[in-house]
Amino acid sequence: MEGHVEEGSELGEQKVLIDNPADILVIAAYFLLVIGVGLWSMFRTNRGTVGGYFLAGRSMVWWPVGASLFASNIGSGHFVGLAGTGAASGLAVAGFEWNALFVVLLLGWLFVPVYLTAGVITMPQYLRKRFGGRRIRLYLSVLSLFLYIFTKISVDMFSGAVFIQQALGWNIYASVIALLGITMIYTVTGGLAALMYTDTVQTFVILAGAFILTGYAFHEVGGYSGLFDKYLGAVTSLTVSKDPAVGNISSTCYQPRPDSYHLLRDPVTGGLPWPALLLGLTIVSGWHWCSDQVIVQRCLAGKNLTHIKAGCILCGYLKLMPMFLMVMPGMISRILYPDEVACVVPEVCKRVCGTEVGCSNIAYPRLVVKLMPNGLRGLMLAVMLAALMSSLASIFNSSSTLFTMDIYTRLRPRAGDRELLLVGRLWVVFIVAVSVAWLPVVQAAQGGQLFDYIQSVSSYLAPPVSAVFVLALFVPRVNEKGAFWGLIGGLLMGLARLIPEFFFGTGSCVRPSACPAIFCRVHYLYFAIILFFCSGFLTLAISRCTAPIPQKHLHRLVFSLRHSKEEREDLDAEELEGPAPPPVQNGCQECAMGIEEVQSPAPGLLRQCLLWFCGMSKSGSGSPPPTTEEVAATTRRLEDISEDPSWARVVNLNALLMMTVAVFLWGFYA
């Protein structure tokens, strides 16, 4: 007992420092590569327009689309969370990744075609076109920004902090602030194109580093068979606490689950019940993959629909890998370091990783620190930084788009392109400030399973949004009143579960939560199913009791009318969607433009450099403003969803092949 406590104390306080030349050289080379790609995209891409900054000019081909989808989804939270939950409970958490193989195809084949023909930049913007009014769009924008700041950013910050603590021993605040600063630089300067090119580079870095560590881990444990032979025996040697209130700890708290090798588990006693995993997770994944701004924005930047579908397929194939690159290495970490990763005594866990409820979240960082040689350890740090920066940059850019296009344009409907771009950049700076201010909260809340935390919060808030998007696309009869009250009713139900769970805490096996069973006993994915159908029923019921939306307002806004050639009359068309045209001076628009140009003094050299750095230089466009006819032609091209028949068949066959592979793997590990 005493020997282990002292060992835990040493592990908790003396970290392995990455201070050798090989590691430092690899890390420096990685950062130079990322910054170089960001600077290259500044020269190459058009960042001086709202479409260029927020949608990469609709010019991305399939492979950066797919790589960016994968890299934006796989953050440091996946390395820490998937490996940690794998260490704690086995293979089932990989179902979160393999479920996405089917949902990402729904995105490319069902949802994106409608988003394209609608001609929208953001998801709240689509709902405004579909239903009219302001309240749904504003509600969804605020909800999305809330989720970005308090779940996505907090999870990435926490998981990045765990890795930095374990691997570097640096001051956590200085390290994370430096990461945020570098991320902010290429987000602010490069726009979405910079993110998608750097995402592509970082995808290869992430996969290369993860493959190398997986090889070392399997070699150490005795191969694939060694993992399955030894995992059920990976038990900590310390099971007695000095705290009289805890005392002898039940074996159910530290023994690996008997069903650890199965994806599909008992519908009542399973940690991830199979009905909840198949249906409840699909609902939450549908929100994330088909209506979340971070993901959909990558698809909307695709060159055409065929490239978007191919990118979704590539992302699906990449999503096969986390089972073998994250979940299984997490299980191996428990086998190799059971007294640390599988600790159960609260005071020992506190010494090992700084939290009393368990240390499974250190599973992946512990492998890196213990197994990787010099140089490769630096590579893995670069991998984790790549994942953290990619995820944060995606959130910064997408939240900037939401705030600028959906909230700020309500306050300043006549704002010009330059004003919108400036506000978008300033919002990124604000998000960075909020992230840094949130660090103490994240550091103090190091309890429970990281992956369970983010999935449970999503399960309480996202299903109403999923229900409304599904009904908006596939049920033309649904109207604004039904959608709005469906969202509000679902929000109230979700908060009725979320608030008690946060108030009482989720607890642990050693110290269970005091949350009343009526609120907290139902598994969060089962609750997602209930919430989805209740919200959908409320939406349909209210829509049936109120006036329908005339079909003239629905052309190319619902799936059944996506190929309609009739002119659509947008609801609330009088509301300005973007920058207002220049004022007319004595009946002459050109005269007013000329007067504005005369009245604006030429910027100095320093200001010109700053404007170019932020993508706001007038000279960057190199051409006069487009005419009305050119704008209309560009709009028609961007909204085109026609496909080359031969390439469409190739893409469809690849989608069928990917689904076949997915079904086989689900069956093999079921």
Swiss-Prot record:
It is a multi-pass membrane protein. One of its GO terms (biological process) is renal potassium excretion. Residues 1-20, 84-91, 165-171, 216-273, 330-373, 445-449, 504-521, 669-670 are extracellular. The chain crosses the membrane at residues 21-42, 62-83, 92-112, 135-164, 172-193, 194-215, 274-293, 308-329, 374-404, 423-444, 450-475, 481-503, 522-545, 650-668. Glycosylated at a single site. One of its GO terms (molecular function) is D-glucose transmembrane transporter activity. It comes from the Eukaryota. The keyword Transport applies. Its main location: membrane. Gene3D superfamilies: Sodium/glucose cotransporter. Kidney, in proximal tubule S1 segments. It is found in: Apical cell membrane. Residues 43-61, 113-134, 294-307, 405-422, 476-480, 546-649 are cytoplasmic. GO terms for cellular component: apical plasma membrane; brush border membrane; plasma membrane. It catalyses: D-glucose(out) + Na(+)(out) = D-glucose(in) + Na(+)(in). Enhanced by the interaction with PDZK1IP1/MAP17. PROSITE patterns: NA_SOLUT_SYMP_1 (PS00456), NA_SOLUT_SYMP_2 (PS00457), NA_SOLUT_SYMP_3 (PS50283). InterPro entries: Na/Glc_symporter_sf, Na/solute_symporter, Na/solute_symporter_CS. PANTHER family: SODIUM_GLUCOSE COTRANSPORTER 2 (PTHR11819:SF145), SOLUTE CARRIER FAMILY 5 (PTHR11819). Electrogenic Na(+)-coupled sugar symporter that actively transports D-glucose at the plasma membrane, with a Na(+) to sugar coupling ratio of 1:1. Transporter activity is driven by a transmembrane Na(+) electrochemical gradient set by the Na(+)/K(+) pump. Unlike SLC5A1/SGLT1, requires the auxiliary protein PDZK1IP1/MAP17 for full transporter activity. Has a primary role in D-glucose reabsorption from glomerular filtrate across the brush border of the early proximal tubules of the kidney. Forms a heterodimer (via TM13) with PDZK1IP1 (via N-terminal transmembrane helix); this interaction enhances SLC5A2 transporter activity. This is Sodium/glucose cotransporter 2.
